[in-house]
Every structure is written in C-alpha cells, then in structure tokens.
Amino acid sequence: MSEKYDAIVIGMGPSGIFFAYELIQLKKAKNILLIDQGKRVENRNCPIEKVGKCVKCQPYCNITSGFSGAGAFSDGKLSLYNDEDDDIYVGGILQEYIGVENTKRLIDYTDDIYLKFGADKKLEGVNFKDEVKVIKEKSKKQGINLINIPIRHLGT
C-alpha cells in the first residue's frame, strides 16, 4: 500500500474522533487514516438477542470495538456548566491549568460541534430551578453537595 497520509489516528473513541476533526479544521491534515480495532459500524451486530447470552465475539466484541466503540449503539451525555456558577464541575481539573473562562470556551466549542452534527438542542437539567434549589438546601444539611448542571443528551 503506497498511500500517503498527513496523519494517522489510532483509536476512534471521542478523543481520536475529535483529534481528527481538529486536524481538518486547523488545516493541518487533509488525508487522515483512522484506525480502530473491530468492524465497520454497519458490519457490527451483537448476537446476544438471538442466543440470550454474550458469546464473546472474537477477536473483538462487536459492541465495544470499532469506530465510536459502544457509543455507536447507545446514547451519551455531554455535561456543560451552569452560567450562574463560577465553578465548573466537569472537565476534571482543567480549569486549574487554563482558567475558568478558557474552560468554559472549550466546553462551549465542544457543545457547538455536537450541535453542528445534529445533537438535540434541548438541554436537560435546566427546568425545575425552584425545586432543585429546595433539594440542594436539604442535601447541604445532610453534608451532600448537589451539583446541578445542564446536560446535552446525545443519541438514542
């Protein structure tokens, strides 16, 4: 195979997919080879419904291996942040490295990409603010810190 690539990305989970996307957006690569173990999405199926148990597909599980892993067949949640709160409760300790505003910008940027590719515009966790406030106060009395942030539902 004499094909030449500007970049080769191994592993097509969210990090690999976003890395390839960014290479293209930044015009750093046009011809990218994406490699992941497992079959193509359209060739992946799980026999568990037919046989009633996991048959341990070989060499790789048809559900967890391949482009997007199990995410190709399930839903996900993109945790955002609360505009009314100075703290960000997602992204680990990223804000300690790049600051709160830059972290918020990255979260917004990621959310915009998902929306661009068809994510549901509706946000979960933004309704019932008064009820959440009451539950949060009750939780605090029990030593529990209830964190309420918007969630974007992705997939099925």
Residues covered by each model-derived region:
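Beta1/beta-strand and adjacent pyrophosphate-binding region of the FAD-binding site
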Residues: S2-S15, L33-I35
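Short coil/turn connectors at secondary-structure junctions
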Residues: K4-Y5, K28-K30, F67-S68
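Gly/Ala-rich phosphate-binding loop of Rossmann-like dinucleotide-binding domains
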Residues: A20, I24-Q25
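Short beta-strand "acidic-cap" motif of Rossmann-like dinucleotide-binding folds
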Residues: A29-D36, V41
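Conserved N-terminal/central alpha/beta ligand/cofactor-binding core
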Residues: R40-T156
